[in-house]
Amino acid sequence: MKIGITCYPTYGGSGAVAAELGVQLSQRGHHVHFVSYALPFRLPTFQQNLFFHQVEMMSYPLFEHTPYTITLAAKMADVTMAEGLDLLHVHYAIPHAVSAVLAREAVGGRLKVLTTLHGTDITLVGIDPSLRSITRLAINRSDRVTAVSSYLEQRTRETFLPDRPIRVIPNFVDSSRFRPGRDEEARSRFALPGERILLHISNFRPVKRVTDVIRIFASVQREMPAKLLMVGDGVERPTAQHLTREMDIEKKVFFLSRQEDIPGLMKVADLFLLPSELESFGLAALEAMSCGVPVIATRVGGLTEVIEEGVSGLLRPVGDVEGMAREALRVLVDEGLHRHLAQAARKRVLEHFDAPRVIPQYEALYRELLEE
């Protein structure tokens, strides 16, 4: 098949999943064409059957802002006609689904459109009064719609009352890349022998509650030697950095900005923290689980579908910093519990979220679309 994929190329779950999906599909013999304003963060530069088409950002005095939705639609249509695309698979409803629907009209209606909902396109952006009606239209005009969790599927139904079914296909991870291991040399760059390393990875938006990560770590390091790695960047980073200085722990916290080698970072971590206000799935938690790194997260949204509470990870209420700190200490002190959580997490990924289990679900959906 010849498949077009559009996603945000920035540091976040939807872009990471879309990029990995494209890689996996190309390895299975499909021709995959990415269409976006920049190369997706995790997309390799050179790979057989994998292509990138950059959207040109036009500048015209009449426009106060570049009309990206329209320029993206035009590029989608151009690539469809030039490359003979069978379908467009867009990740994130706004504006990508709107652009795909416009592109379909531009090429005469023969193009199939699949929209995958990832979370904030529904729970934050889409519910804005100025975008609510167009979000609903984009969902209803897509030929198929998927959501990354049952939680998100239900939220979409309750909020937008769509006139078509929404299929749940979960996010996935390549377990051959995200696998257990320990890199003592890399650990030595951050911690002394005997020190524990806690890890957080996110886009540092307010919903990630990165200051909770700092406060959890502050409690842990008072009881045992430990370091914290904060990976990513975003609007909350300065606030988090200020808090480390305020709590006099800045020498124990490393802000590493955006990193490409996430599997390598997992190999230095003893524990992963994700105290988010809301997660429609929680890809970072899944990647940690695949690497056998125990996860402590919040009992919200799709995280309850990813993590079997008390079996493959530990969950606490949003804002329960003391509770998460206690759980962190319990896991770091009890080697048996740490080992059990690590093994159960890896097992859950292999059984439910490994790429070879999920990619065929998308392929089947593509075939279903094209056979209509």
Which residues are covered by each model-predicted region?
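Aromatic "clamp/platform" in nucleotide-sugar-dependent glycosyltransferases that forms part
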Residues: 258, 277
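Carbohydrate-associated surface elements
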Residues: 151, 172
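Short hydrophobic beta-strand element within catalytic cores of glycosyltransferases
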Residues: 294-297, 307
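Nucleotide-activated donor-binding/catalytic signature segment of Leloir-type glycosyltransferases, i.e.
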Residues: 241-257
